[in-house]
Amino acid sequence: MKAPRLGSEEVSYSDRISYLPDDLLLRILSFIHTSDAISTSLLSKRWKFVWKMMPTLDLDEDSCRNIGTLRFDEGCCMFLKSHEAPVLTSLNLKLMTPSHDIDRLLSNIKPILHEITITSYRYSTIRFPRNLNVCQTLVVMKLQDKVLVDVSFPVCFRSLKSLHLTRVKYSCRESFTTLLSACPVLEDLDLFIGRVHYDCLNSFTIWVPSLQRLSICDESYRFRSTTFEISVPSLKYLKIACQDSCFKFVEDMPNLVEAHVEANQHETKNLLRFLTSVERLKDPDLTDRIFHQLLYLELHLHKRLNGDRILSLLKHSPNLQTLKLNEKPLRSIKDQPNISVRKPNSVPECLTFHLETLEWQGYAGRPEDKEIAVYILGNALRLNTATISRYFSSSRFRHHQKKDLKIVEELKSITKASTSCQLVLQQFIEIKYSM
């Protein structure tokens, strides 16, 4: 059998792949590690320059400590100098050994770079600006773990829209503020504060007029208290998970549509006046305020949220369409006192006109739980779906069977105000669970 022909050249059965067009070869290389993709340059002349057009580079020191006779950082510099693609969509650097040459690596990037992720497991310094071209073209920048951020000189990330800072350290208090002020069109800021030995700041000033999404997580609460001063008038999405932090919001956030707040009760009260415009809210520590725009409410139930609180929230959310209750009891039902639920004087407006979806995960079947279920199902005229789920441990499955059957029958017997409501009952088994 004769070998097939492509154009004027014979193609051997052992090397058909080499005659594929560049875009397909680049697609193939995207599925293997970058160091392996670079090694294909040794296969033949056809492969020698293909990797240089790869739109993404993933350089991981853990899987490639040395590149030939070169150290990892030296090899990276060589690769970045050799890269010829007009646009480098993504560059991912993972450093395992101490390096003070990250900025030198960045200075070797020739093409337009849109996204960069730098993860360092030993303290490594990034100094800006060393490569002004990179600073001007970046759209997404993610710095993770033991990266020391040093912004000592004026710099402008004129295209940067997303900035993630995860457990990084700052060379001085001004580095964080200077970095934010250098991002005139920033829309997304994800700030993860590490424990005390990771970063030196205990106060953060976030003044970003263009910011639309802000996420703050502070895991240092056991070691210190962190203070945040925030001015983000264009914010739409807010997530805060800080147990012992202090927040000062300088101005209102009229565009806010979704918030997830996990903070101490005092700080949550301070935040409430900024949350009255939200459409989606996840918050365990609410007080009585009117949320006219709230369409979605998710509550993680614990001892601070009893039945009275849930019904009060329904009263203060007149346009609510979706209610999600998530409960994972930490102690036995028999150890918990029965609490009678006080019904509001009038049926909440959301039950009469708007509530369409109810999800209750971890329904425990306590008397007050049943009272809440009876009240909501018996008054929600527009309810389409009510999904109620129970959790129990695999080790006590048989022990709970009879009790569970009783609870299921109780739920099925509840009279529903909405004739179109579909009641869905689910059971989930957890490995270890005290109930």
From Swiss-Prot:
Cited Pfam families: F-box (PF00646), FBD (PF08387), LRR_2 (PF07723)
Span of domain FBD: 341-390
Domain of life of the source: Eukaryota
Domain F-box: 14-60
Protein name, entry field: Putative FBD-associated F-box protein At5g56820
PANTHER family documented for this protein: EMB|CAB62440.1-RELATED, F-BOX/RNI SUPERFAMILY PROTEIN-RELATED
InterPro entries: F-box-like_dom_sf (IPR036047), F-box_AtFBL13-like (IPR053781), F-box_dom (IPR001810), FBD (IPR006566), FBL13/AtMIF1-like (IPR050232), LRR_dom_sf (IPR032675), LRR_PRU1-like (IPR013101)
Cysteine disulfide partners in this protein: none
